[in-house]
């Protein structure tokens, strides 16, 4: 036995990791994620969930939040915070039909505090500001159109991402089908979701209800992608498990498997760090689900259940050794990884505007700043997408860059859809390449973890960066992958950017430099806890040097490493804090 839990302590490969965290007790006692959520739903004295249920609703795809802009004012009035939930839908590969879109648009308008739909870096949508009386209605509305939110949060395999490449339609379809298969294979088998939210029949549970995840589920969240090179829009190195598509003559034949990526860290704790995924090797298609289960169960058994800050797969690999972890996966899957097939990641951005696929269909990628679909003054974006949904015969594809593709448009419908997009501010040639390559997480006012602004901070900050680029004579193609995240948990994927800002306190950020265009290098902290004004001053100096000293076609991140402005992070555990 390579692992055991005795006397509330965990031992892995002979090493005692310590006393189990309280989250392990919570999961053990939850009766396969049921807890007392149903009783909490009936309690209208508070708008929130209590005790363990605050954590358990995450496994059902929700986070309890409140509006931090009005928290102090409510406290003065002796009111509790305005508790509500954010829901993240399970949409493997990010494909949604026009009919589904119209239903979620209607729900967001009628039953959420903010009236918006938020496209996220997890290639799905989020509802923000749903009050307790509307939560069950929300789940039942989604269920009526074939959508759920099982396992989009919590210690489980989250929403499976898939490269959105509308040009390679046949290959994309194959990859998308695998994303769906992997999602279903790794999904919790508990009936708790249906019982609580869909008024399903109560069933007796047994120990083997969760053959892959186990009764206590995973030590920490787990993220999976299917990616088609050379496009790395899903950012493989932000994820625990990645299947890199290998094709011959346009047909998918297998995957290279990358394990152990992740970006979250904790300020001041050098045992936490962002980390690239390791390449385990190549597998044929028929072994995909076996390998997925083997990686997940190895992490289930070997991941740290004592310290949640060190519980993710990336830390397990660094603790036990990549070769040891890989050998265990081979043993459990009954395979031997072959040598990785050649591939290269060259880009991550979405191709904004129209492209034609090899199937003759047209695809329109709409740039949605920060993924926030809302009707702004003079730019009714949310209404615009709804109007397109009313006449669109194809589907929509949400991207991991928080944009939206109107996919599968016939030649006869193209002009009508473009007209609607332009009328509602969804197409704008004035959007710079810099803005298209900038991204932020939600942060304030809804995220309880946010230490600084991100989504609300980004638009003006990008305008300021555009001014700096222009000042130094750089043209529109000379842009920088720029990302802002309001805390070190990494939702905005700043730790794979050329310039990454990580929130430290209101108005203050850590400035990281040295990532690259393809998303294959982790940036390193350049300045700590500085203000927006100081950040812009630093960027001004750095961009000035880049403009004058760069090699032909040298991107900003590569330049900062080459000239020694920042040291390259090769092995995160060794280099990130060095």
From Swiss-Prot:
BP GO annotations: cysteine biosynthetic process; hydrogen sulfide biosynthetic process; sulfate assimilation
GO CC terms in record: sulfite reductase complex (NADPH)
Disulfide bond residue pairs: none
Domain of life: Bacteria
Binding, [4Fe-4S] cluster: 441, 447, 487, 491
Metabolic or biological pathway, per its Swiss-Prot or TrEMBL entry: Sulfur metabolism; hydrogen sulfide biosynthesis; hydrogen sulfide from sulfite (NADPH route): step 1/1
Gene3D superfamilies for this protein: Sulfite Reductase Hemoprotein, domain 1
Signal peptide coordinates: none
NCBIfam families listed in its UniProt record: CysI, PRK13504.1
Name assigned to this protein: Sulfite reductase [NADPH] hemoprotein beta-component
Species annotation: Vibrio vulnificus (strain YJ016)
High-level lineage: Bacteria, Pseudomonadati, Pseudomonadota, Gammaproteobacteria, Vibrionales
Gene symbol of the encoding locus: cysI
């Amino acid at each position: 036995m390579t692992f055991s839990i005795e006397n509330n302590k965990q031992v892995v490969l002979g090493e005692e990791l310590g006393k189990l965290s309280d989250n392990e007790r919570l999961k053990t006692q939850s009766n396969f994620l049921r807890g007392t959520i149903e009783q909490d739903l009936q309690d209208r004295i508070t708008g929130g969930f209590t005790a363990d249920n605050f954590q358990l609703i995450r496994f059902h795809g929700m986070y309890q939040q409140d509006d931090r802009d009005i928290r102090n004012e409510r406290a003065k009035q002796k009111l509790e915070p305005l508790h509500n939930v954010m829901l993240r839908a399970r949409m493997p590969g990010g494909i949604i039909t026009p009919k589904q879109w119209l239903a979620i648009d209607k729900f967001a308008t009628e039953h959420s505090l903010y009236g918006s739909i938020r496209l996220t870096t997890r290639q799905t949508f989020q509802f923000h500001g749903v009050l307790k009386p509307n939560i069950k209605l929300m789940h039942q509305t989604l269920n009526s159109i074939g959508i759920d939110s099982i396992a989009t949060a919590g210690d489980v395999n989250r929403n499976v991402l898939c490269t959105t490449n509308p040009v390679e339609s046949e290959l994309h379809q194959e990859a998308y089908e695998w994303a769906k298969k992997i999602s279903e294979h790794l999904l919790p088998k508990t009936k708790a979701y249906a019982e609580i939210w869909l008024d399903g029949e109560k069933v007796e549970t047994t120990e083997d209800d969760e053959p892959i995840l186990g009764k206590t589920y995973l030590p920490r969240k787990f993220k999976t992608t299917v990616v088609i090179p050379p496009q790395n829009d899903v950012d493989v190195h932000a994820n625990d498990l990645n299947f890199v598509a290998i094709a011959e003559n346009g047909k998918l034949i297998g995957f290279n498997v990358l394990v152990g990526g992740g970006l979250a860290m904790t300020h001041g704790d050098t045992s936490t760090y962002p980390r690239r995924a390791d390449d385990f090797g190549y597998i044929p298609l028929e072994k995909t689900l076996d390998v997925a289960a083997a990686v997940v169960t190895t992490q289930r058994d070997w991941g740290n259940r004592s310290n949640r800050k060190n519980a993710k797969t990336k830390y397990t690999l660094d603790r036990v050794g990549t070769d040891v972890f890989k050998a265990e996966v081979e043993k459990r899957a009954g395979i031997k990884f072959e040598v990785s097939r050649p591939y290269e990641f060259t880009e991550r951005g979405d191709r904004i505007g129209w492209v034609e696929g090899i199937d003759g269909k047209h695809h329109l990628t709409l740039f949605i700043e920060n993924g926030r679909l809302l009707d702004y003054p003079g730019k009714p974006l949310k209404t615009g997408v709804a109007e397109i949904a009313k006449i669109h015969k194809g589907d929509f594809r949400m991207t991991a860059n928080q944009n939206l593709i109107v996919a599968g448009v016939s030649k006869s419908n193209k002009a009508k859809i473009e007209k609607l997009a332009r009328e509602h501010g969804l197409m704008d040639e004035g959007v710079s390449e810099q803005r298209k390559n900038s991204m932020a997480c939600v942060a304030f006012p809804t995220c309880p973890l946010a230490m600084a602004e991100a989504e609300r901070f980004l638009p003006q900050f990008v305008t300021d960066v555009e001014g700096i680029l222009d000042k130094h004579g750089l043209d529109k193609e000379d842009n920088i992958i720029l990302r802002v995240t309001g805390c070190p948990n990494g939702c905005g994927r700043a730790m794979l950017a050329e310039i990454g800002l990580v929130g430290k306190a209101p108005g203050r950020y850590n400035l990281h430099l040295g990532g690259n265009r393809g998303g294959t290098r982790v940036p390193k902290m350049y300045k700590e806890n500085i203000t927006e004004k100081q950040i812009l001053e630093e960027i001004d100096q750095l961009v000035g040097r880049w403009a004058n000293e760069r090699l032909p076609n040298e991107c900003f991140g590569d330049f900062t490493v080459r000239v020694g402005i920042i040291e390259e992070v090769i092995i995160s555990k060794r280099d990130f804090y060095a």
